[in-house]
Amino acid sequence: MAKKRVVVLYGGRADEHSISCISTAGVLGAMDTERFEPIPVGITKDGKWIINGEDPRGWNLDGGELPTVKITPESRPVMLDPSRGQDGFFIGEPSHINSADSGFGTSFVSMSDPEMHHVLTSLGHVDAVLPVLHGPYGEDGTVQGLLEMMGVPYVGCGVFASAACMDKHYTKVVLDAAGIPTAPGVTVDARNFTAADVLAEIEDAGLTYPLFVKPSRAGSSFGVTKVEKADDRETQQDRLAAAIATAGEHDWKVLVEQGIDGREIECAVLCPKAGDEPEASWPGEIVLDHQNDDQFYDFDSKYMDASASHVEVPANLPVSVLEDVRDVARRAFKAVDGVGLSRVDTFVTPDGTVMVNEINTMPGFTPISMYPKAWDATGVSYTELITRLIEGVLR
């Protein structure tokens, strides 16, 4: 049987660019190459699609340096002709990548132009796309919309679920409407606010400290600040203003959420084929072995300091509570019309209440990430997980 050809998209324009690269290294290393022919296509930080660049299989964080998609002498641009669907992927010459007057300033071409046949080579038929892209311009419905328009099967949530879950404000709107508890909070426009007005809104909402201030549309703990209670209003306003400014560097829409007294428990959800009932893994917990001064699980703790934490699956909770987390995760996934995969992050309070923190439609996918580790502990190996996700979208 012929191998199915799978374009693996990685990198991208988001802050999470390097995390996407690391996830892709794991995915390519675990993919069943007896069934699939992976075709890695990198996206540079400025949005150029390239092939034949640096091999992502060798990337890791052992050296402490974050990998990025770079244009090398061997790199060639990838162009798309949306009208040709699964046969609409083409490769240009290296000189086309940065040539301003070559006509290749965009990734879109029309092969109805006879001239294009002299300068572009077909990538061949693509059976599916696996977008291992985190954050905006990849996990937010934009790439999903492009692939929908082309009629190319792809792994993961569709346009609506991707967009709704990328924007934490609208995740709350959807989940609240579905009767699923979320952390109390307010939304602030970082382009136009006064700290006094924000503080008044926080007080009107009855939020208690500490507060977590975060970008609405960012991940991997970028731009997140923990704000403690101050002794006076002026200091409190200064702290809030600084935290909103930090979050505003990543997104003008900023959430100010009440810190929840509870444990952060994560659950992996799998639904390879649209319309099937979603499955939920045993929930897991990231246990902090030591913390930085901010006392929360920040970017460095997640990715740069291997000694900062370890993953426990299943989490050390009563089975009844674990089952409640699984149930809430499935309900949340269905509420946003999820398909493919998601990691549902929850808080479990001391009285056993399960609240959804956020839904990641393309969670970290490295071998040590929670999503594959949770499924491995539930009986689905890393390789089997990737196989099921791809085969679920094949025609």
Swiss-Prot record:
Binding site for ATP: 204-266
Subcellular location: Cytoplasm
Listed EC numbers: 6.3.2.4
Chain ranges of the ATP-grasp domain: 172-391
Residues annotated to bind Mg(2+) 1: 345, 358
Keyword list, A-Z: ATP-binding, Cell shape, Cell wall biogenesis/degradation, Cytoplasm, Ligase, Magnesium, Manganese, Metal-binding, Nucleotide-binding, Peptidoglycan synthesis
Main location per the UniProt record: cytoplasm
Binding-site residues for Mg(2+) 2, renumbered to this chain: 358, 360
Cofactor(s) needed: Mg(2+); Mn(2+)
Biological process terms in GO annotation: cell wall organization; peptidoglycan biosynthetic process; regulation of cell shape
Record-linked PROSITE patterns: ATP_GRASP (PS50975), DALA_DALA_LIGASE_1 (PS00843), DALA_DALA_LIGASE_2 (PS00844)
InterPro entries, per the entry: ATP-grasp (IPR011761), ATP_grasp_subdomain_1 (IPR013815), D-Ala_lig_Van_CS (IPR000291), D_ala_D_ala (IPR005905), Dala_Dala_lig_C (IPR011095), Dala_Dala_lig_N (IPR011127), PreATP-grasp_dom_sf (IPR016185)
Biochemical pathway: Cell wall biogenesis; peptidoglycan biosynthesis
MF-aspect GO terms: ATP binding; D-alanine-D-alanine ligase activity; metal ion binding
A single GO cellular-component term on record: cytosol
Catalytic activity: 2 D-alanine + ATP = D-alanyl-D-alanine + ADP + phosphate + H(+)
Cofactor note: Binds 2 magnesium or manganese ions per subunit.
Family to which the UniProt record says this protein belongs: Belongs to the D-alanine--D-alanine ligase family.
UniProt function note: Cell wall formation.
Name of the protein in its database record: D-alanine--D-alanine ligase
